[in-house]
Amino acid sequence: MSDRTLVVSASNLLSRGFLVVPTDRRSRDGEPVNALFAVARAIHRVLAFKLPARAVAVLEASPNLTGWPPLLVPQLAGLRGLLEALGVHVVEAPDEVHVVASYARAALAAGDDAIVVGVDKRYAQLVSERLWWYDANKDARYTPEIVHKRFTVPPGKVAEWLALVGDDDALPGVKGIGAKGATTLIEGHGSIAGALAALDTITGRLGNALRAARDDVPRELARARLDTERPLPVALTALGYAPPDVAAQNALYDRLGFAELLSHDGDAIRVEPCATADDLAAALARLGARPIGVAASREVEPPAGREDSPAGSIALHALLEDPAPVRAALTGIALAAGTGEACYVARTSAAWPALVRWLEDASAPKLGHELVATTVALHHAGIRLAGVIGDSAFASHLSQPSNWAPHDLPLVAKHVLGRALPDEDAVRGVGRARKRWDTLPIDRAAAIAGQSAAAASAVWHALSPTVDPALLAEYRELSDTLVRMELTGLIVDPDELTGAEAAFATLEVELAQQIEALAGHPFNINSSKQLGSVLFEELKLPIASHTKTGWSTSIEALERIEHAHPIVALVLRWRQLRRLRDSWLNTLRRCIDSDGRVHSRFHPARSFSGHLINTNPDLARVPGRTPEMQRIRRAFVAPPGRVLMSVDYHQLGLYVLAHLTRDPALVDPLRQRADMHVLTAAAVLDRPAESITVDDRQLGKVVNFATFAGQGASALALQLGVSAQDARQLIARFDQRYAQVRAFQDEQLRLARERGYIVTLAGRRWPIGGLESLDPQDRSYAERLARRATHEGSVSDVSRRGLLEADRALRRAGLATVPVLQILDEVLFEVPEAELAEAARVAATAMRHAFELEVPLVVGIEAGPTWADLVPIAPA
C-alpha cells in the first residue's frame, strides 16, 4: 500500500471556511476563530481517513486581503501556528493553488498517493485514481467518478469546463454558457479548441455566446488550468508527518474554544454500580467529594460558576421513566466528576438511603444538566435536592443560545466535548417496545447514566468560565422558581373542557357551511390542494408563499392574506377549532395529574431570545384573543379560598425599545401614557391623531411590530394587504418619525458584523451567524435578526427578571402567593383571597422595578376565579 501525502491549500481553506462556519465562534479571549475552526475541522476529517507519511500546507506569500471581511483578517495571523499544531509543515509561496498542484504532482511522481484539501473547484482537474480532492466546505471527497458526476466531465476536462462556466470572481467564465452548455460543447467537440475551430457550425444561443467571447476564452482557460511544474519551496522528502503532541494541541484548542476537536483518548468513563453505602462512600472519595455526613465549613452558595466553584463539585444524572417529571418513575442516579470515573446507585440498592442523604445535603456542591426536571422528579420521590451550584444547560444557553439549541445533553456534549453519548433509543427501543430502565441490566443503565453525568460535569467546567457569573447566578435562582411553579401547577376543570369540546364541534359545522357558501360549492376544507384551488384559482386571491409543489395554505400564509376575502378568516377560525378539538383539548386532558392540576414543564434555555418556553402542555398556546380560547381559559380555575392573579407588562416591547434607543418620539409619549399605536398610525398615514379609527390603530400596531422586527416592505405589504410601494412609503414615514429606532437597528447590525454577536439588556451575548453567508436568503435573515435581536432579547430579560423578582419579593414578604405560569409578558399567580391586595402590591412593585428603564415600566393587574374571568384590580 502506498504512502500518502497530504497537501493543504491553507489560505484558500481559511478564506472559504469563513463563509460556512458561523462568525459568532470565538476564542476564550473573545477573538473571532470561525475560519480557523474550519481549517482545523477539515484537517481532522482528512486525518481520520488515513494518517499521511508527508504533510504540507501552502500559504499564499502575499495574499490580497481586499474584500476580506473584518472578522477574517485577524485570523490569518493564527493560521501557521494552528497548522503546525496539527503536525502539518507550512510553506509560503506566491500562486498558492499552483504550488499545491505541484506538490500533489510531485507526490504522485514519488510513488505516493495524495489528497488535496481546499475549496477551489480547480483542484478537481488534479483528481485521479491515486489523488483525491477533499472539498472541506461540502465535506466531500472527490474521486474520478465523483468528479464526473459533479461536473459532468472527467477530471481532465474540468479546466475547460470551468473556463466556460466560471467559478466566483476569479473565473468569470463565458456569459450565456452554463453547466449544461459547457458539457455539450466539450463532449460534442472534444475540447474548447475543437469548439472554437468548429465555431461556424455551432448555432443557437451557445454559438452566439461562444462567438461573443471568442477572444476571451483562451485567457479564461489559462486561468482555469493549474500549473503542476512550479518549483517546490521545500523538498517533499523534508515534509514527513509526525502526529502532534496531544497535550499541546488540546491546550491550543482549549484557548481557541474548539471543544469539539479536543482529543479524548483515554477519557473513557468507568462507571461502577454501588451496592452498599460503603461502596458509595468509596466512590465519592474517588470522585473527590466529601464523605457523606461530614459537614463543610459552610453551606455552599449558588454559584460563582467559574474555576473557583466549590471543590468536590459532583455532577448527577437521574434515569427517569417518564418525560413528565411529576409522573416520572425514578430508577437510579449516577454521579461523576472530572476524574474519568462515575458511580451509579439504583433505587433498589442498599446504597440508596446514603445517596439520599448526600442529595439533601446543602453543603455538598452539585451540578447537572436541566436540573429543573430532575429536582421536580426527586421531589415527587420524596427527595429534596439541595446544594446545586450549576446547570450545564444554562452554561450552554448563555454561551451559544442559538447554535446548540435546544441544549439537550447529547447535542451539547457533541458540540462542546466532541463526544457522542450512548443512544438511549438504541438501548431501550422505541414506541411500545421501549424497555423500562429497571428492566435493563444494571451495567447498561449505569453506563448511560454515568457517561451523561460525566458529560454534564465536563460541559459545565468547559463553558461556565466563559459566561458572566452574575447571569449564571440569576438562572440558578430562576430554576428554583421554576421548580416551585412546576410542582404547584394549575387546576383544570375537566367538565368545562367537555362543554367546550361540544360547543366547538357545533361551531365547526357552522363555519364549514359558511365557508362552502362563500366558495359556492362543497369541498374538503382539510385538503390543502382543494383549499388552495378554491382560494387561488377560483377566488383569485393573492398567494402569500409557495411550497415546492405549489401555493402554501399554511396558517402563516393565510394570515398574511386574511384581509383579501372573508373566507380566509373563516378558514383560519375553522382550522383553529379543528386543532383545538383534535389535539389541544385531548392533550390537556391527558396532562391532568392525579391532583387535578396540569404541571407544565418550563424551559428557560431553549429559546434563542431567552423567553421562557413551557411544554407538556404548552400553555402559551392558550391566548385569550378569541372566544374559543377564552372558553378554554375558563377551564383553568383557582381552588377554594384562592383566586388567580395576572400581572402583565403594558406594551413591554415599546418601553424596552424606548430605553435602548432613547428616541424622543418613543420616550416622551410613553412618559405621558399615550397610545403609541395611534401615534404611529397618525405618522405613517400623515393624519392627526384625533382622526385615527380603530382600524387605523390596528394598522399602526402592525407597522410598529413589523418594523421593530426588521421586516421589509414585501412582508408588511402582505400583512396589510397593500402594495409594496405603499408599504415602502409607510416604512419611510415610520423611519422619519422614529429616526433613532432605525439608527439603533443599523448600529446593532454593524456591531453584529464587527463582533459576531449582540448584547442584551442583562448582558447576555446572542451570537448572530450568517451575516457573511453567500446565500442571499440566509444573509438577509441574519441581517434582520441582528437588527432586532438586542431588542427581542432584552424584552425576554425583563420578563425573566420580572418573574424572578416577583417570586423573590413574595417569599420575602412571607406571603403564600405563588407564580404558576409565565407566558411572554404575563405572570399568573395563585393567591389566597385574604392576601390578594398585598400580593398584588408586592408582585407589581417587584416587576415594575425588575429593570430601571428610561421610561418606568407599567404593569396591569387582574384577578378572578378563572383564567378567563379576570378583572382589573388596584394593589394595596
Which residues does each PLM region occupy?
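Non-catalytic, usually N-terminal nucleic-acid engagement modules in DNA/RNA processing proteins
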Residues: 1-67
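Extended two-metal-dependent nuclease catalytic cores across DNA- and RNA-processing enzymes
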Residues: 72-233
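Conserved catalytic core of nucleic-acid polymerases
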Residues: 435-438, 480-487, 542-544, 593-607, ...
